[in-house]
Amino acid sequence: MSALRLRNANTPAPELDELSDQTPSESRVLKRQMSMSQRAMSNTLTSAANLSNLLPTGTLLAFQLLTPVFTSNGVCDHATRFLTAVLLFLLAASCFVSSFTDSVKADDGTIYFGFVTFKGMWVVDYPDPSGLGLPDLAKYRMRFVDWIHATLSVLVFGAVALRDKYITDCFYPSPEAETKHVLDIVPVGVGVMCSLLFMVFPARRHGIGYLVTGSVDRR
C-alpha cells in the first residue's frame, strides 16, 4: 500500500516538470503571436485612418453620424437594413460625384466651387454669368484621371464601411468563419491597393468636401 502511494506520488512529478519546462516557451510564443497581431491591428487602424483622408469630409462626417442611427447601433431588422443600404449607396454616390468637383480662385481672391465638364468647369455660385474675373476654365476640364479617382473613392468608402462595426453587425450579425475572414482581409487589401493607386495618380483637384490649399490655380 505504501509502495502504491509512493508510486502515485512520484508519477505526476515528471509531468509537472515537463509542463513547467514547456510553459515558458509556449507563453513566449503566445506573447509573440499576440504582439504580431496587435501590430497588425495597429497598422490596419492606421491605414483606415489614412484612407479616410481620401474621402470628402462631409461624406465621412455624415457616415459617422448617421450609421449608428440607421443601423440601431448594429442591431438591424429588414427595414433598417434596407435603409442602411440606401444610405451607403447615397454616400458612395457622393464620393463619386465629389471627384468631379473643383475650386477656382477669382481675381478678388474669393474661392468658388463648381463641377468639371468635358469643356471646362461650371462654377455654381459665381455672380457674373459671363465668368469675368475667373481664370481660363477650359484648363479645368474633365480628364480620364478624374474617373480613376472617382472609382477609387467609391472603393475606399466601401473599405471604410466594411471596417465599421455597426455596418458589419447589421449585414453580418453572425458571420461564418470564412465570411469573417473575408471581411477582415478584403477591406485592408482594397485600402492598400487604392492607396498605391492614389500615389501613382495623385489628386490635384480641391473639390467640394476636400481641403483647399492656398494655391488653387495649379494648372
From Swiss-Prot:
Primary gene name: DMP5
Predominant location category: endoplasmic reticulum
Spans annotated as Disordered: 1-24
Coiled coil: none
GO cellular component, one term: endoplasmic reticulum membrane
Protein name according to UniProt: Protein DMP5
Pfam families assigned: DUF679 (PF05078)
Localisation: Endoplasmic reticulum membrane
Database matches in PANTHER family: PROTEIN DMP3, PROTEIN DMP5
Biological classification of the source: Eukaryota, Viridiplantae, Streptophyta, Embryophyta, Tracheophyta
Record key words, sorted: Endoplasmic reticulum, Membrane, Transmembrane, Transmembrane helix
Function: Involved in membrane remodeling.
Organism, as annotated: Arabidopsis thaliana (Mouse-ear cress)
